Amino acid sequence: MRPMAMALAVQEAINNVSAYVASFDGSGAAPAMTTTVAASGTADATSTDTGGQAVTVAAATSGGSAEAGAALYTTCIACHGADGAGNQALNSPRIAGQSAWYLTNQLKGFKAGYRGSKPEDIYGMQMRPMSMTLADDQAIANIAAYITTLNGAVSPATLDGNAEAGKGLYVTCVACHGADGKGNEALKSPNLIGLQDWYVVRQLQNFKAGIRGTHPEDINGQTMRPMSMTLADDKAMKDVAAYIISLRK
């Protein structure tokens, strides 16, 4: 009976998300987003070309100071790189191009312990003490603002996923992350464009296994977990990741 109940829970979650998105205007379109000018002095997202692939660099919307964040970011360089491109050898994702609001939420999550506190989350546990070097919410806002100024190159595919098969699976993701994969702040859905395929797969595995998205304070993670359960196995996850990479073009 338990698998049946889980299947119903997953479908209900999908229906709820779809209904919420549809409530915006009847067409399913999300409301227009308002961008706040950060201390870095830029409000508009910019695009950079990396190896023939256009990647959007998110605008800073945290209200933080990118200048102050630059000094704080020195702690992050060893793993994420000076340009925020990440490092697979260190299991560090690309953070360049990510939205300030999402970076802020995740850093707060690590610091509060609802992300990176489970023994199974080895790499999350490595990140948690890093978040604790940030004294307060202002420091988090500052470093998030600085990261939005980075434009580290995206990584090529590393897995053998099938993008065509992943396209069909991605329909579940469209309501929150968008057909273009760029996310939606109103739905607390991050930008997926530019993330490495291995990182996408690992996070889907973590959500499905309950390593992520089960803490009572992780409201947004709880929304994502049933979505991960729609993917039958690791192959399906690799296929979705391959399709997400194809959205860069």
Language-model segments: residues:
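The canonical Cys-X-X-Cys-His
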Residues: V17, V21, G69, C76-A82, ...
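Mature, folded catalytic cores of secreted/periplasmic enzymes
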Residues: M1, C79, A96-S99, N105, ...
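Electrostatic cytochrome c docking/interface patches
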Residues: D25-S27, P31-Y73, Q88-N91, T148-Y170, ...
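Sequence context of c-type cytochrome heme-c attachment sites
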Residues: M1, T56-A59, G81, M127
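Sequence context surrounding c-type heme c attachment/ligation sites in exported
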Residues: A70-I77, G97-A100, T104, K167-V174, ...
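The feature marks the first
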Residues: V57, A66-A112
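Axial heme c-ligation environment in periplasmic c-type cytochrome domains
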Residues: M1-M33, Q88-R94, F110-A141, P156-D160, ...
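Conserved functional loop/turn residues at catalytic and ligand-binding sites
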Residues: H80-D83, S99, Q126, H177-D180, ...
